């Protein structure tokens, strides 16, 4: 009998734990998260973005390798009763692209969406990363202009600042710069993607070995390896343009210079830096790409960029640009920076006895009608006469 209770106790202790990579959020932490989400959403909506909600799971093809999203091994896959392979969304952008193609196929004016929800990535436990995170983001579909690029970056900056973060930097790049050098070097798409993985993973030995294997000439090899060194203030753009001879890469720098001028018009240039070696793991990005960094967390708290070919996959030919803010990482950074999050709702406690319950209930109802949060609690010896 004793052994039965011991086994039951072990089982009970196991049941209260969550799987690796997910966690409970409650109390003050959840209250702060709610406030920050509201502040981010408030600023994004102020730019004319309208809420959209897409399913938590989609057909596998929405996130397949051909789309250029998360690798298959990192997807949470399961089957429905008809045998269809379904996936918990690892990324919002393909879902938004699918939705836009379905409901706004004939729209020729820019469409602005914003959204909030959780994404799921089946990463290794050894990486120590959350497998379920909350993201808030926005997508601007149907506008391929420099102004659209700048709007996304400026809106990101203003949203982070509005939420209470002041010490951060948005690093901006352009994939076309790297692609131009790859094309000049004669690299095929598969080799280019492999090289991108090496460079974005800071594996420069692997990158050099790959270029040696593919017999890239010395000049192109030096240019490709130098990409990771081209980062800094707007002054780096002139140096980056001098470093290349192909028009595709030069045009990429021209685009960045124009975007920077518009960001100066917004007055947010002090938060902006440039990185020509920024290469995303998402293959659907086509041009301008940006990430947001702050101290207190190792990963980027913002990820965004242009994906002008993605909607074509779903039948709609339209340029697009978007970003996501990883809310969990933002909150972790704000906590470590000791940023005070104001606006957390307070709660009023009203205690009652059997004799005065009706009176206390009336008081609670009046306070609730005035917008207060009220707990109605039985009075005990421990809480005494407090109301």
Per-segment meaning from a language model:
Residues 54-62, 111-122, 169-178:
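Short, glycine/charge-rich beta-strand/loop segments that flank catalytic centers
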Residues 66-70, 184-186, 288:
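Short low-complexity, flexible loop/linker segments enriched in glycine and/or proline
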Residues 74-80, 187-208, 268, 294:
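Acidic, His- and aromatic-enriched active-site or binding-groove loops in soluble protein domains
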Residues 131-136, 172-180:
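Short, conserved phosphate-binding/catalytic loop or strand-edge motifs used
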Residues 148, 160, 167-170, 182-204:
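Internal, well-ordered alpha/beta segment that forms a basic, Gly-enriched binding/recognition surface
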Residues 167-176, 195, 273-277:
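Short, surface-exposed recognition loops or helix-turn segments adjacent to catalytic cores
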